[in-house]
């Protein structure tokens, strides 16, 4: 069976580009390039929640070692967004399912199930709050250390509804194109492979239009497997009605 690089070589050859395109196989950190510097770096490094699988580390390594001064990176910016959603039916299916599994009580597994983010497509009608940008990474200047962060967010309710989860997605930018291009993986746009990442909350929040949920989003690579992510989301709803006020913090592992 041929590997993808074998097919790539065939494609280069049949298109008469062998004198212009050189293909190398190997890890970026290990491969030896036939030249000292490059003018452009192009990489599709994005994972679920933007940073899952830590592929951006390799792009930053290539940038620091090979990119010429004033060289170009595509894409060159990435922003993570958050929003609150109503998703009671699916939350009950995913979490409440463990209360009765063919007549048996599996409820001890609920605590584990809620720590696992769900990668799925979210209907725009389920989105209750305005989107909130949390972090923007500039690939010309960011470092590996910047990929672990603890940052505030604030979500403003568009309508009165319940909030069962928060979701995250990302936008990327190609600012150096002749006409700048922006590409989104949010619920407001067409389906993409990355979908959205759903984080179910322990509480069900009851919000009125105009109220805000504030909190902290923390992300860092898992210590045992740096391609996995340890994510923490705190939340606080200060409602006009004290009976609706709620706060908490949930831990998630993306693996």
Spans of features found by a protein language model:
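Class I SAM-binding transferase module
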Residues: 1-218, 222-255
């Amino acid at each position: 069976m041929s590997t993808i690089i074998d097919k790539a070589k065939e494609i280069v050859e049949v298109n008469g580009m062998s004198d212009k395109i050189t293909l190398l196989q190997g890890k970026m950190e290990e491969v030896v390039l036939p030249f000292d510097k490059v003018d452009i770096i192009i990489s599709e490094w994005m994972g679920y929640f933007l940073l899952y699988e830590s592929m951006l580390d390799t792009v930053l390594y290539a940038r620091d070692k090979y990119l010429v001064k004033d060289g170009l990176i595509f894409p060159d910016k990435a922003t993570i967004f958050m929003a609150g959603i109503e998703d009671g039916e699916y939350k009950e299916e995913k979490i409440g399912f463990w209360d009765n599994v063919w007549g048996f009580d599996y409820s001890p597994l609920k605590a584990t199930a809620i720590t696992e983010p769900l990668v799925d497509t979210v209907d725009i009608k389920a989105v209750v709050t305005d989107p909130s940008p949390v972090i923007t990474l500039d690939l010309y200047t960011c470092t590996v250390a910047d990929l672990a962060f603890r940052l505030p967010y604030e979500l403003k309710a568009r309508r009165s509804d319940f909030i069962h989860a928060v979701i995250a997605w990302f936008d990327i930018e190609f600012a150096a194109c002749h006409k700048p291009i922006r590409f989104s993986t949010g619920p407001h746009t067409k389906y993409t492979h990355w979908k959205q990442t759903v984080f179910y909350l322990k509480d069900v929040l009851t919000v009125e239009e105009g109220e805000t949920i504030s909190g902290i989003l923390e992300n860092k690579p898992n210590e045992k497997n740096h391609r996995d992510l340890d994510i923490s989301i705190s939340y606080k709803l200060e409602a006009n009605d004290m009976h609706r006020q709620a706060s908490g913090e949930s831990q998630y592992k993306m693996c």
